[in-house]
Amino acid sequence: MTGDDIAKIRAIMEMRNPEFAERIGISRQHLSDVETGKKPVSLKLQAKIFMNVIDTPEYRNHLRRLQNLTLQAKLS
């Protein structure tokens, strides 16, 4: 997982930096540093993102909605 991957996950969730950082239990600055590549993505951070974001019904619903929009755009 890279900082860019984390930024994409945050975008899928339609969350701003402060909200996402709070959800995964890190500071806004740390999240920004990770997303921009200034700090590495640790295994501990990956686990926090998985447990608090990816492995949730909310994330799956957002992802499903985006997939449906993409499919509709391709069919148009």
Locate predicted features:
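A short, Lys/Arg-rich alpha-helix, primarily the initiator
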Residues: M1-I12, F50
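Short, charged recognition helix plus adjacent turn
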Residues: P57-S76
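Hydrophobic alpha-helical segments, especially transmembrane helices
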Residues: A11, Q29, L45-A47
